[in-house]
Design a protein with these regions (language model features):
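Mobile cap/lid helix-loop segments that gate and shape the active-site cleft of serine hydrolases
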Residues: 71, 164-198, 204
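Alpha/beta-hydrolase active-site loop
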Residues: 107-126
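Active-site glycine-rich loops that stabilize anionic/oxyanionic intermediates
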Residues: 56, 63-68
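N-terminal cap/lid segment of alpha/beta-hydrolase-fold proteins
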Residues: 17-53
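Conserved alpha/beta-hydrolase "acid-adjacent" motif
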Residues: 215-221
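Short beta-strand/loop motif that positions the catalytic acidic residue
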Residues: 202, 208-210, 214
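Alpha/beta-hydrolase fold nucleophile elbow
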Residues: 129-140
């Protein structure tokens, strides 16, 4: 359920690296990069602050598969759009295996979820963040993890899922492109996750976006999710 990129839009604003402890004074209207400790290692994230005093709702952005050493940087344009157009703060996290995040990737989704949850826990402490109003946006690979977050953050008020896969068993059976990624050890009957059984318990509104002619991840995945809501 990956989407391959050759190009991505560069973020409009200048980005600077800051220690997390100084982000309480991050400049308004800008994006700051920070590294935080998680899962016995370190991970990279970007935080965009809107103009004004706040506190601001927080949009959590989870990126898709990228080529080269790019992670959360690939969704900074979207992060800055949320900040400038909607006055939402935006947190973009480089998932394990991407960007400067050093947490080793793996097939267990908890590895990625723990990194994201640790980043969110840190950012919620900032005085200009409204910790009671969280939103999550996930694209492709990121949409899968965004869907998993829906029941793991009580403060989520809305979810946007773009071009994701939500029943990995169906993806595995129907698309040979993803078999080596979903089953790297070559197990005969791999146990893969389906998010669909838990969807009925989601409490926040959900927007599902998917291209009808997507040749990598079938629009059937979006339809299955929609029918389960």
């Amino acid at each position: 359920f990956t989407v391959f990129y050759v190009f991505y839009l560069a973020a409009c604003n200048f980005t600077r690296t800051m220690p997390f402890k100084t982000l309480g004074d991050a400049y308004a209207g800008g994006t700051s990069r920070f590294v935080f400790q998680t899962s016995g290692s370190s991970a990279e994230a970007y935080l965009t602050r809107p103009a004004g005093l706040g506190p601001f709702p927080l949009m959590i952005l989870l990126h898709g598969h990228t080529l080269g050493p790019i992670g959360a940087e690939s969704v900074l344009s979207e992060a800055e759009a949320f900040a400038s157009d909607l006055c939402y703060a935006a947190l973009a996290v480089s998932l394990p295996g991407y960007g400067a995040t050093e947490v080793p990737p793996g097939t267990d989704p908890k590895i990625t979820l723990n990194v994201v949850l640790d980043a969110v826990s840190l950012v919620k402490r900032l005085p200009w963040i409204d910790s009671r109003r969280l939103y999550v946006y996930g694209f492709s690979r990121g949409a899968f993890f965004a869907a998993l977050l829906a029941n793991r953050l009580e403060e989520i008020e809305g979810t946007v899922l773009h071009s994701g896969a939500y029943d990995l068993n169906r993806v595995y059976q129907g698309n040979i492109w993803f078999r080596s990624m979903l089953n790297p050890t070559g197990e005969k009957n791999p146990k893969l996750i389906s998010i669909l059984p838990e969807v009925a318990t989601w409490h926040a509104p959900t927007l599902i976006l998917h291209g009808e002619e997507d040749f990598l991840v079938s629009v059937q995945q979006a339809n299955l999710l929609s029918e389960s809501l």
